[in-house]
A protein has these predicted regions:
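Buried hydrophobic-core signal for structured, non-transmembrane domains
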Residues: 1, 143, 150, 179-183
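A contiguous, surface-exposed recognition patch within enzymatic or periplasmic domains that forms
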Residues: 2-145, 153
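Short, hydrophobic/aromatic beta-strand segments
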Residues: 3, 7-12, 161-162, 191-195
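Active-site-adjacent structural elements in folded domains
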Residues: 133-134, 261-264, 294
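Short, hydrophobic/aromatic-enriched beta-strand segments in well-ordered soluble domains
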Residues: 144-157, 235-236
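Long, contiguous interaction/recruitment modules in multidomain scaffold/adaptor proteins
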Residues: 162-269
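Alpha-helical segment of the N-proximal tetratricopeptide repeat
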Residues: 267-301
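Residue-level recognition of tetratricopeptide repeat
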Residues: 305-306
Length: 306
């Protein structure tokens, strides 16, 4: 897990992908809806509906990790300073997307004062490679190597964004102002086009030529329209779509199940199950259960299964 520190405080907001609707605690012991928490999480009552993507709304030391996402980015935004940080990596290799903070309360503020003289509160924007939750361990054999790439990218102007890559960041968000859109360049964008369309319709609501240097942005608002689901697409000079976003349509899905403790060794009836539980306990150095109880159970079930 990479662990960059990002400025916390009243203006901080986590930028999780739009398809993240649930988050887990360490070891998936607890779960919460996201970004609007509606239950109890870390013994805090959020039943009124609280946006836990905002630092100021999380009173106690709290971790949360995205249950899953099909997007390749995660980030943080500071509303006070019009700037933020994005992490970009292939989500098939880097599924872990996490935030941790000391909490916006007397306890957390005491830690802020102890850990820094002048810099104030921070959050940990953590990103997991080959792991979607902590703790999560695996084996690395002799002469084995695992390779990965990840990128940390500053950005400004756009605020909360809906997709990002190594080349660009896009925004498409409805608000009281209208349909807010934006594009931020990480690589030079010459001869590109940015288009916004209603899905299923040919005519574009916006179709503009783009010429942006790195660290520059364009943005705007579409007024007076209320279309159905929209898509925003950034295309290169050859017409290839290099980054896109289709408006996420929230669904009333049940929260995922939290992790459950395995059966005791004597209650296991499958040699494979006994083996995998034992291996898991061995990898995680479990404090109260011995992997050898499960290995011995597997041998007792079938001494010839090896």
């Amino acid at each position: 897990w990479a662990n960059p520190a990002v400025k916390g405080g009243e203006g901080h907001q986590s930028v999780f992908p739009p398809d993240v609707t649930a988050v887990f605690d360490h070891g998936k012991r607890a779960v919460s809806a996201f970004p609007i928490a509606t239950g109890t999480y870390y013994k805090v009552d959020y039943s009124a509906g609280v946006d836990i993507s905002r630092y100021k709304n999380v009173p106690v030391p709290t971790s949360y990790m995205a249950e899953k996402s099909q997007y390749d980015f995660v980030g943080a935004w500071c509303h006070d300073e019009d700037g933020g940080l994005l992490h970009v990596a292939n989500h098939h290799i880097a599924p872990g997307k996490k935030q941790w903070s000391w909490g916006h309360s007397e306890f957390g503020q005491a830690w802020d004062k102890s850990l820094t003289d002048n810099n104030g509160p921070y959050i940990e924007l953590m990103t997991g490679i080959f792991a979607d939750n902590q703790p999560d361990f695996t084996w690395l054999d002799a002469y084995e190597e695992k390779r990965f790439e990840q990128y940390f990218l500053p950005y400004h102007s756009l605020g909360m964004v809906q997709n990002a890559s190594r080349d660009a960041v896009i925004k498409l968000q409805r608000s009281e102002r209208g349909i807010e859109w934006g594009l931020y360049a990480i690589s030079p964008l010459n001869g590109y086009r940015l288009a916004i369309r209603e899905i299923g319709k040919c005519n574009a609501l916006l179709d503009d030529a783009v010429a942006l240097m790195p660290a520059t942005a364009i943005q705007g608002v579409l007024h007076g329209i209320n279309p159905d689901r929209l898509t925003i697409e950034l295309s290169d000079a050859d017409g290839n779509i290099i980054l896109s976003y289709q408006e996420h349509q929230p669904q009333a899905l049940p929260l995922p199940d939290v992790a459950k403790a395995p059966l005791s060794a004597q209650d296991i009836t499958s040699t494979d199950e006994a083996w995998f539980i034992g291996q898991h306990l061995e990898q995680y150095h479990h404090a109260s259960r011995s992997p050898f109880d499960y290995y011995l159970r597997g041998v007792a079930l079938d001494p010839l299964d090896y």
